[in-house]
A protein has these predicted regions:
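Class I S-adenosyl-L-methionine-dependent methyltransferase catalytic core
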Residues: 1-148
């Protein structure tokens, strides 16, 4: 399925801040998290902290990391960069699962439906469930935007 052009200019380094309400949906699933795709001041890291998470947020080369930042991390939670065709997001998911079995990724609703990704979802022993957001995430500041 082809993606439509949004009409918005692409953000530098693909930085699209995650709204607070999205973070609160994953709150019951983990407490000590690492967000490897944002700096400490990111909205996702701040929202996780406000919800009661202990958060390590980094923005270095995640794919080059051989281990978790410390042994108290029980999950990797991030809005990964997508890259062309979602390839970079797939690399993020694969590497995150190599580091820890508990991973929460903010992805397009249809991201798990591709045949090339069955190893990450259908055939992955760690895949428990998919949380589908009923409200659309607004990634850009807009006056006419709706949502929580």
């Amino acid at each position: 399925m082809a993606q439509r052009q949004s009409g918005y200019q692409r953000q530098p380094d693909d930085v699209y801040e995650t709204p607070t309400w999205v973070t609160q949906i994953i709150a019951p699933y983990c407490r000590h998290v690492w967000d490897p795709a944002n700096g400490p001041a990111s909205r996702l890291a701040q929202s996780l902290r406000q919800t009661g998470f202990e958060v390590v947020a980094t923005n270095d080369d995640f794919l080059a990391r051989a281990s978790l930042p410390h042994d108290r991390i029980d999950a990797i939670c991030t809005n990964p960069p997508y890259g062309n065709g979602g390839r970079l997001a797939c690399q993020f998911i694969t590497h995150a699962l190599e580091l820890t079995p508990t991973v929460a990724m903010l992805l397009r609703v249809d991201f798990d439906s591709g045949k090339a990704r069955t190893n990450l979802f259908r055939d992955c022993e760690h895949f428990v469930h998919k949380i589908v957001l009923l409200d659309r995430i607004v990634w850009f500041e807009r006056e006419d935007a709706s949502g929580p």
